[in-house]
Amino acid sequence: MTKKVQHRLPRAAAGLTMVFCLSSTFAHAQDTANPDSQDLPNMGQQITPLAPPGARFEPMNPDLTANPSWLAGQAVTTVASPDGKTLLVLCSGLNVVFTGSLTSRITSQFVFIYDISAHQPVKKQVVQIPNTYNGIVFDPSGTHFYVAGGSDDDIHTVTLGSNGTWAEEQPTSPALTMGHAAGNGLSVQPGGTGPVNAQVGVKPCAAGLAISKDGKTLVVANYYNDSITVFSGGYGNWSKGTELDLRPGKSNPAQVGVPGGEYAFWVAVKGSAASATAYISSVRDREIDVVSLSGTPAVTARISVKGQPNKMTLNAAQSLLYVVEDETDTVDVIATASNAILETIPVIAPPGVLPTALAQYTGANSDSATLSPDEKQLYVTNGNLNCIAVVALGGTNSGDQVVGLIPTGWYPNSVSFSADGSWVYAVNGKSPTGANPGFCYSGGAPTYPSCIPANQYNPQLLKAGFQTFPRPTAAQLTTLTAQVAVNNRFSFTESAGDAAVMAAVRAGVQHVIFILKENRTYDQILGDLEVGNGDPDLTEFGQAVTPNLHNLALNFVTLDNFLVTAEVSNDGWPWSTSARAPDVIERQFPVFYSSAVGVSRGLSLDSEGVNRSVNVAYPTLAERQFADPFTPDDPDLLPGQTNVAAPDGPGNEINTGYLWDAALRAGLTVRNYGFFVDQTRYNTTTNTIPLIENPAADGIVVAYPTNVTLAPRTDPYFRGFDNAFPDYYRYAEWAREFDNNYLVPACRAPESRKPAPAPTALPCAPHSQTARRSTGMPSLSLVRFMHDHTGNFSAAIDGVNTPDLQVADNDYAVGLLVQKIASSPYANNTLIFVLEDDAQDGGDHVDSHRSVAFVAGAFVKQGALISTPYNTIDFVRTMEEVLGLPPMNLNDALARPMADIFNTTPSAWSFTATPSALLYAPRVSLPLPPQPTGLVVPKPSHDATYWARASEGMDFTSEDRVDPAGFNRLLWKGLMGDKPYPAGPSGMDLRHNRATLLVRYRQSLKEEGRRN
């Protein structure tokens, strides 16, 4: 047997190792003698899918002729045939693979078909489906199965032929289509090179599927139409579908504007055609809608549940419905005869496995459940804990509990059993990504040199896993449970040293400023830094573009082993603001981000307060339409203020699981500058919010909040995400409030109708008694500086209209804010935390998640290189500890604060913001300090016309609507010239001999005529 490699390397060297070990585990899937772990460095966890005795763990290879080694991602649903001999595995995610050129790609989802008649799975076939979203079901005959078509708004029928091959049937008449012109929502569509137009309606999305016992009734959940469609007649004789809108106001005028039935996701059907009943999980409204299918479908009951209902399963007698719920991490057992909830089963861990201090927290992301054939156990997948919870069912519907945990791959989504119940089949959606320096895609102008796409975009690197093992015995479960506890660090306690450091920092710090930025990797920004493990060959926005970020790293701490937890902005904002991404986001983002590589599969960016682009922070239709006149005139469109993607707070207080909620619960103060702001009306052809540099001077509101808690705490004059608007003016608005509201009169800067030039240090003596938690500056300030995202070059104002200028603008805004605090009375009791929400927009030689992070203030070490492996969750936990806040969920409760970056006593510090020389270009009209004598102003790599032409057709209306892969390649070509894009991962530790490395790098810049 091949001995597998241990994973106890420092993260700086782990990028290459992670890729090798993942491949090694798959290649030697039957070797279970040494079930070594795989690290998840961006999560602080490890996985051990080979831990169950007799386990196999293998990739999902669809055997594409054009790319035989490519592996599918996001396995989401398993279903066994009625005779238990065949297993289907549905992959529903990004799954776009380039096969040699820009125009040659496969854009399919996949159904893997396995023979499990002899327990060990044998792959027989892979069927390609254009689009899908979780839903798949066998016909009771076992000779057909149905797959919901996602944004295609249809159902695919796949039939077993006489030759033993499965094939999709061509649509019959009438076809199994739902006939939706659009979903319920607001769609923001790009309008060519100019402004955008907001349009009513989003793409539909066919999700869960269920069929009656006799095969005569088929029900599909219409996720974005808040409805179900019912087909009658059976295979070969299906009638045209009948739709039932599940929203109360659509069937009862007295209930117009009452929430209910929205985000219909999963379906279970009880009974046969003549008397069938459907149960539908409404994710947003936290209810199970009970629908009678006799005659005209009608809602007969709504069963309220505490969590977000996900997948469901019926027992064989169809007397009990098991509903898995995220947010609560529970399973509700519902009696189908009475619609009563008989019991609620916690499914995080067996009693006593979690330390008492952790028992109050949730965050397991429970997402599916399957009954064993003997119905003595219920297997529940806990996505965020990478395990299956085994629930012992006593038959009394009371006192059932978890008796063990089984390790799985990363983010399990579904599990099935063999017919006799002796074997288990589990699938997961993710895998470690490793390095991605070859993130390569030829985008932009057609004259650019072509490039073979490397399929290294972050979500493309997330590969599905298929785990199979004999059903564990009770004794084996004990061992496996202990392994899950180790994998998730359930026994973690903060060391005495860390606790002492954090206590000292907490005692001296009263204010935290949290700056959130966009999408950059470590190598893109700090690859050319004098210290640390950076690769200058991957540096696109180096010292010449980002002098302030470089100075922050050198003056304070260089975090060269910091990994963001998220893959993209859709999950990046939840991870950055709440230390978790709910299952609804984990399920949606891989499908949504197919648009990032040129394939639209629908869904929306729900993680910043809008749901389907509708601002649900406002309680009434009139208020919504005042904030956004594009809002459809429909009181039943997502009524109420529930945000489907927001995490819960303690005690499952709905939607209050964010960092600012925790601060407010602790009696602290919060001010918001740009977080959770509606972007719909930026750059529109009508109803536009104007691009003005100083909206406060004219009293023009430019920020309409999308979070209920933040709404009264949001600066209405601080513009949200908009690439056309420089971060300098965002800083200026923050500084206006700071000067006017948080300084004593002698320290205030004068008011101005135009932003003043960057101020010098204010001659104010510290007045520490004024700058306390109870008065003065807020305890927690949220500041969004987003211009490092770059884009929208044709509309950008004040000449800040190229990528390097926009990143330089972002860098200067960060520097100005740090300078402002450094020269203020708050210098000694404030910490400034700077984070990227994700690292999707570039390559890195260590890990695709490695990014920049900065911390500044009196308690931060100075001139230190810190290579401790930290991640976003640790970052959030650190801010919590500084503010004296308890953890929000299991993730941050198990995180280690970043104590290595702090001293226990404050040090004097200062900071002077330095504009990049690029910003002194003649066409840039930002109010900068006087140009230093002798400063040579380099020309930007290209002018705005070049960048506008190269990015024509790209959608910059919101983060991540643009094709990141194409945009990254466009940036590389425009900034780096003809320098070849790196071909593959190195994983090298480049901390040593940096002086020699950088001399060679700078010499190459001169030879190539570039600056960086």
Regions found by a protein language model. Give the residues of each.
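Basic/polar N-terminal segments that are highly enriched at the extreme N-terminus
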Residues: 1-5, 28-32, 1012
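Bacterial N-terminal signal peptides that target proteins for export
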Residues: 2-14
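Intrinsic low-complexity/disordered segments
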Residues: 3-4, 25-27, 759, 766
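Bacterial N-terminal signal peptides
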Residues: 13-24
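Predominantly soluble domains enriched in secretory-pathway, periplasmic, or organellar proteins
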Residues: 24, 29-498
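N-terminal pro-sequences and low-complexity stem/linker regions of secreted or lumenal proteins
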Residues: 462, 478-1012
